[in-house]
Amino acid sequence: MSLVAGRGPLSKDPAGWFSSPLPDDLVFVEPHPRRVQAIRNGQTVIDTERALMVHRRDHPLSYAFPADVVGDLPSDPEPEAPGYVHVPWNAVDMWLEEGRRLVHYPPNPYHRVDCRPTNRGLRVRVAGATLVDTADTVIVFETALEPRLYVEPSVVRTGMLRRTETSTYCNYKGYAKYWAAVVDGTVVDDVAWTYEDPPPECLPIKGYLSFDAARADVVAELPASGQAPGCEV
């Protein structure tokens, strides 16, 4: 995400605007001087610091490698970088960047997560019961996503929550575990989630809860969405 996905500046629906229109087929390629490794059958099959990062609209962020470092792995040439090729993500068993295992795609150097303590209010109700009503929150500003509030468990009626088997992964916040709300026999699955072991930049929300407005009655005091001057509300 970030540059070409979501509402990133090079996406088809940017949050901001440029002085002149950008071409629809715009591709941004840049050096990515980090150690990237690929493991297959227990063997390191790629180990390079010469990868490129390719940002292409409607495509996941991807690495391009010098053709001479990919061996017999399947590959396709990168038209915007002669001599470089793409290797399918599932062609190997594991990808590493600077020793960190990657799950879905490369981490985006333009993606940022800011966690700020705030006094913005959050009220969450499920089946008529209030789970949280507090202004002691942390607001998370994440590139290309809407701001979101998190709260520590001490201000939540956690007795009405129980863990589910759902788990998801974010390249920037880590693994999320989910919670169901149980209120007088009514069960709403995956109404909340927590990141129990986030990376250092997200430690302010470690163990904190955020709630899904599509599954609960959530009233959150969030910043107004920005828009270009002259656009109608």
How should each PLM-predicted stretch be described?
Residues 1-233:
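Terminal leader/tail segments of proteins
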